C-alpha cells in the first residue's frame, strides 16, 4: 500500500491553531504534540511522573513498537503544564469529568483547532508530529536525531520525512560553485 503522508503544517498555521484553541488543556496538548513529536496515544497516556521538569524531558514508556524513548520538553510547554494541575498525580490530561481522553476526542480537538485557525488541509494529530519532524529537518537537525526523537526503529521510516521537506533548493549551492 502507498504510505499515507499527513499534511505538513507551516509554522504560522501551527501558531494559529494554538492561538485559536481557547481551552487551555487542549491548547497545551497541541503545543506538546508539535513541540515533542508525541503521538496522540502517548498524549492521552502521559503521566505526571514521566515528566522531568529539571531536565526538560518526557519519558515515553511503552511507545509504539514497545520501546521507551525520551523526548524534549519545550520551555513554553513546561510553563503551560505547570498551570494545568497543582496535584500533579496520575494522568496529565483529563476530561472535565476527570476521565482519560479517547483517541477520537484528541482527533476532534486537533480538527476543531485547525478549522478555527482557518486551515483548509485535513489536519490530524499525526500532522503535528509530521510537522515537528519536517521543521526540525528544515532547521538542519540531523535525521538520526529526529529518528531517535520520533522513536523510529528504522532510519528508512524517518527518511519519509525528507521527501516532503520543502527546503529551498535554490539556496543549495553546487560544489562546483564553491571552488
Short names for language-model regions:
Residues 1-179:
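Conserved catalytic core of the tyrosine transesterase superfamily
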Amino acid at each position: 500500500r502507498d504510505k499515507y503522508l499527513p499534511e505538513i503544517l507551516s509554522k504560522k498555521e501551527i501558531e494559529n491553531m494554538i492561538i485559536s484553541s481557547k481551552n487551555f488543556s487542549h491548547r497545551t496538548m497541541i503545543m506538546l504534540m508539535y513541540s515533542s513529536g508525541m503521538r496522540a496515544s502517548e498524549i492521552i497516556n502521559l503521566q505526571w511522573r514521566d515528566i522531568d521538569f529539571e531536565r526538560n524531558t518526557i519519558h515515553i514508556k511503552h511507545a509504539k513498537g514497545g520501546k521507551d524513548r525520551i523526548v524534549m520538553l519545550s520551555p513554553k510547554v513546561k510553563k503551560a503544564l505547570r498551570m494545568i494541575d497543582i496535584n500533579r498525580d496520575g494522568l496529565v490530561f483529563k476530561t472535565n469529568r476527570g476521565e482519560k481522553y479517547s483517541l477520537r476526542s484528541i482527533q476532534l480537538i486537533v480538527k476543531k483547532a485547525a478549522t478555527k485557525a482557518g486551515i483548509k488541509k485535513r489536519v490530524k494529530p499525526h500532522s503535528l508530529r509530521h510537522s515537528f519532524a519536517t521543521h526540525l529537518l528544515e532547521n538542519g537537525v540531523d535525521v538520526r536525531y529526529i529518528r531517535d526523537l520520533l522513536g523510529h526503529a528504522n532510519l528508512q521510516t524517518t527518511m519519509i520525512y525528507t521527501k516532503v521537506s520543502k527546503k529551498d533548493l535554490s539556496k543549495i549551492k553546487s560544489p562546483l560553485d564553491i571552488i
